[in-house]
Design a protein with these regions (language model features):
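Propeptide-to-catalytic entry region of secreted or membrane-anchored zinc metalloproteases
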Residues: 1-48, 195-199
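The catalytic-center signature of Zn2+-dependent metalloproteases
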Residues: 92-181
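Pan-zinc metallopeptidase signature
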Residues: 176-204
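Short, solvent-exposed loop/turn elements at domain surfaces
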Residues: 16-19, 60-64, 95, 179-182, ...
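Short, conserved catalytic or adaptor-binding loops enriched in Gly and charged residues
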Residues: 1, 76-79, 163-164
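Residues that flank catalytic or metal-binding motifs in active/ligand-binding sites
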Residues: 3, 46-48, 81-83, 168, ...
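Active-site-proximal segment of zinc-dependent metalloprotease catalytic domains
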Residues: 31-119
Length: 204
């Protein structure tokens, strides 16, 4: 499904100055952590700008293969200029395979309130794989038209515990193959997220 949303680089900065929307800062890391004190030096007003930080070491721990991270709409994060998407620059464009090039789309999905298709089943689960790690029914991504995935990296012929084929090309899955789509229900959820108090001023 097509949500008809366009993301554009800012043309006007916080003080009204002309900008390309791209700023370069050397040797920064760790903005993938919830609180990153140095981020305050660079953050633009989260009510007016969607901040995307591109770096190689997302968590400041020397690990450079984490692909990306973002957070669901949260007015407290927006008020504190903590709302953001953080993306590993090593995976931009032709630097990597097609699957990792779509990580930014995946993280934008989280920014607009989409969960993974496998919810929190990213590790071991109890007997009865339709249960999550807490032993509760797995809600998938809370979107009715997205088949639940019992775990990440389910493929084209894999079925979930309800017998449904998984939506393996969904952007909110993890996959070693090309992800390429959102369901209509996911699009509706993202459009609803645009009216959240943490996001609405970005487009109004």
């Amino acid at each position: 499904a097509n949500m008809n949303i366009t993301f554009k680089l800012a043309e006007k900065g916080p003080q009204g100055e002309a900008t390309t929307g791209i700023l370069y800062h050397r040797l920064e890391s760790g903005f993938g952590n919830y609180y990153a004190p140095r981020m305050a030096l660079y953050a633009w007003d989260n009510h007016k700008y969607m901040n995307v930080y591109v770096m190689n070491d997302l968590y400041g721990d020397g690990v450079t293969n984490n692909s990306g991270v973002s957070w669901y709409p949260d007015i407290e994060m927006t008020d504190e200029n903590l709302a953001r998407v953080v993306y590993n620059g090593a995976y931009i464009g032709t630097n990597t395979d097609e699957n990792f090039r779509r990580v930014l789309t995946h993280e934008f999905g989280h920014f607009l309130n989409l969960a993974h298709t496998f919810d929190d089943n990213s590790g071991a689960w109890p007997d009865g794989c339709n249960l999550n790690k807490a032993g509760e029914p797995n809600p998938g991504d809370w979107v009715e038209d997205t088949p639940k995935a019992d775990q990440p990296l389910m493929g084209a012929t894999d079925r979930n515990c309800e017998g449904d084929l998984t939506n393996w090309t969904n952007y909110m899955n993890y996959s070693y193959v090309r992800t390429s789509m959102f369901t209509k229900g996911q699009v509706d959820r993202m459009l609803d997220a645009l009216d959240h108090s943490a996001r609405i001023e970005l487009w109004q």
